[in-house]
C-alpha cells in the first residue's frame, strides 16, 4: 500500500470514528488467504468459529464468518467478525474492507450487514466493535475517544493485512 492510500485510510478512519460518515473505510489491501486457521501474523490475535450468533440482520449462510480478536496499540482487545466471500479460495488474494458502526453500534448491527454484503461481492471484510463497546475490552463503557477509535481502525487494518 502506498503512502497516499495509507494516509487516506487514516483520514477516513478518523472521520468515521468521529461519527462523520458512519459507514466504512476501504483498506485496498490484498489479503493473502493461505491458511486462516493460523489466524494472523500479529501477536495477541486469534480466529475461531462464530458461536452464539446474535446478529440482528438476515444471515446469508453462503458467507463464512469467523470470530476474531486482536489487540490495539493501547492494549485493548478488539472483537470482530471476519467475513469470507462465497466460494472462498485460500490460494487467491482478496481486497479487504474494515468496517465499524457509529458510536455505540456493534458488529452484529449495520456494520455486520455491510460486511456481509461486501463479502457477497468478493471482499474479505472485517466488522468490529470499537474499544469500550460491545465485546471489545475497556472498562469505561459508552465513552467517545477518537484517538483510541482511530487506533482500532489501524489495528483492524494491520490484522487483515497480516492474515496468513
Positions of PLM-derived features:
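Bacterial Sec-dependent N-terminal signal peptides
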Residues: 1-10, 28
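Hydrophobic helical h-region of N-terminal Sec-dependent signal peptides
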Residues: 11-16
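Conserved alpha/beta-hydrolase
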Residues: 117-137
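Short beta-strand element of the alpha/beta-hydrolase
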Residues: 91-102
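Sec-dependent signal peptide cleavage junction
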Residues: 19-34
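N-terminal cap/lid segment of alpha/beta-hydrolase-fold proteins
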Residues: 44-92
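The serine-hydrolase catalytic nucleophile loop
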Residues: 104-116, 130
Amino acid at each position: 500500500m502506498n503512502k497516499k492510500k495509507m494516509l487516506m485510510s487514516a483520514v477516513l478512519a478518523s472521520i468515521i470514528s468521529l461519527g462523520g460518515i458512519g459507514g466504512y473505510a476501504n483498506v485496498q489491501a490484498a489479503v493473502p488467504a493461505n491458511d486462516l486457521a493460523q489466524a494472523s501474523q500479529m501477536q495477541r490475535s486469534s480466529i475461531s468459529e462464530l458461536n452464539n450468533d446474535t446478529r440482528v440482520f438476515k444471515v446469508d449462510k453462503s458467507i463464512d464468518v469467523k470470530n476474531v480478536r486482536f489487540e490495539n496499540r493501547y492494549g485493548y482487545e478488539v472483537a470482530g467478525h471476519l467475513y469470507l466471500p462465497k466460494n472462498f479460495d485460500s490460494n487467491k488474494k482478496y481486497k479487504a474492507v474494515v468496517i465499524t458502526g457509529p458510536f455505540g453500534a456493534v458488529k452484529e448491527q449495520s456494520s455486520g450487514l455491510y460486511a456481509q454484503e461486501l463479502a457477497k461481492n468478493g471482499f474479505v471484510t472485517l466488522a468490529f466493535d470499537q474499544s469500550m463497546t460491545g465485546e471489545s475490552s475497556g472498562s469505561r463503557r459508552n465513552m467517545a475517544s477518537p484517538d483510541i477509535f482511530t487506533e482500532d481502525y489501524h489495528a483492524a487494518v494491520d490484522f487483515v493485512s497480516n492474515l496468513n
